[in-house]
Regions:
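N-terminal signal-anchor/initial transmembrane insertion module
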Residues: 5-8, 12-20, 24-28, 33
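Transmembrane alpha-helix/helix-exit interface in multi-pass inner-membrane proteins
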Residues: 226-243
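Membrane-interfacial helix termini and the short, flexible loops that connect transmembrane helices
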Residues: 18, 22-25, 51-54, 78-91
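Residue-level signal for inorganic ion chemistry
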Residues: 16, 234, 280
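Juxtamembrane transmembrane-helix termini
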Residues: 53-54, 177, 236, 240
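Alpha-helical bilayer-embedded segments of polytopic membrane proteins, i.e.
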Residues: 25-75, 102-106, 156-171, 182-230
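Short, charged cytosolic
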Residues: 1-16, 157-168
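Membrane-embedded catalytic scaffold of the fatty acid hydroxylase/desaturase
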Residues: 67-183, 246-328
Length: 328
């Protein structure tokens, strides 16, 4: 029996969005954001090299850690966007441009992310056979794949929500494993350069206690910032078997497996555009800066054709996710 419910009219919406110019690449604006990140990193070096002269107050290391966290989050979002070719149409160029942000600033593999995210996740969203993200927490979010581990049930809330504080190191480990297994040695070398380039000066010029403070603040703020953004995208949404997903159109699969969040410009900045998840999945190459406009068009289109558009507040999304965990 077919699970399809939506009419096959994605081309109509796509034509409207394209006519509005919202699918056009943004090389200038994208370049400005990339340059801003590099300038911000230079500012970090200036502060680090002059740490003793600046004589920062007691909270100086915390402030530096928070500032670097903002830089790192922007680097994550920029590398995500550029690998989707939102800035430049040329895939090879986009890959090369991602390296300073993905490999050097955050020590992540662009090749791993492209395979895991762009190829598997976007093509087979919430299809457990292909999209490993939906198998989180022992398959708690994919009913047919849900495990039954007694120890996990006992500590499920602590494990799931506690894991949010370790997403960044988990990404690094997965990136290194992928690069080594796939023999991406050039990329691995760039990823390893992260440590002497980013952290070498911090630990050389700062007192050890300050350097450790910067490192810990960044890791324990960056991880939940990213994690609490990522989990709202698809966890708690519909899940399909591979054969079921093949009966759905592109539009129906992406809309039924994704959740967008309400909110304006600040929410859009804070979540790096991931709050417009439905729109990002329908139009992965559409620039992040255009997604709020595309969201309005998509909502109007869904209402016109009586299609469900799944949107919640950020808090509602976390409650829905917690409700699923409760059933594990």
């Amino acid at each position: 029996m077919s699970v399809a419910k939506y009419p096959d009219i994605f081309d109509e919406l796509k034509s409207e969005v394209r006519a509005a110019g919202l699918l056009d690449r943004i090389p200038v604006r994208g370049s400005i954001e990339m340059i801003a990140i590099i300038i911000s990193m230079i500012l970090v070096y200036v502060v680090v090299f002059n740490w003793e002269n600046i004589a920062p107050p007691a909270f100086g290391a915390v402030a530096l850690g928070l500032f670097m966290t903002i830089i790192f989050t922007r680097a994550v979002f920029v590398s995500h966007d550029v690998l989707h070719t939102q800035y430049f149409k040329n895939k090879s160029l986009s890959f090369k441009l991602s390296y300073p942000f993905a490999a050097i600033i955050i020590s992540n593999s662009s090749s791993w992310w492209d395979f895991k995210h762009n190829i598997n996740h976007h093509t087979w969203c919430n299809v457990p056979e292909k999209d490993e993200d939906i198998l989180a927490m022992d398959g708690a979010f994919a009913p047919k794949y849900k495990g039954n581990k007694a120890w996990l049930r006992s500590y499920k809330y602590l494990i799931f929500w506690g894991a949010m504080f370790f997403m960044y190191p988990a990404f690094i480990i997965q990136s290194y494993n992928f690069a080594i297994k796939r023999k991406k040695y050039g990329e691995l070398a760039l990823m390893l350069m992260h440590w002497p380039i980013v952290w070498g000066p911090v630990f050389y010029f700062l007192p050890f206690s300050d350097a450790i403070t910067v490192y810990l603040v960044l890791n324990f703020v960056l991880s939940p910032w990213l994690a609490f953004g990522f989990i709202t995208n698809h966890l708690g949404c519909e899940v399909f078997e591979k054969d079921e997903s093949e009966d759905l159109t592109w539009m129906e699969l992406q809309m039924r497996t994704s959740r967008s969040l309400s909110g304006g410009a600040f929410i859009h900045w804070f979540y790096g555009g991931l709050n417009t998840q439905i729109e990002h999945h329908l139009f992965p190459k559409a620039p992040r800066f255009n997604l709020l406009k595309i969201k309005k068009m998509t909502q109007d289109f869904a209402k016109k054709h009586n299609m469900k558009y799944f949107e919640t507040t950020p808090l509602e999304a976390y409650v829905q996710i917690n409700d699923v965990i409760k059933k594990y």
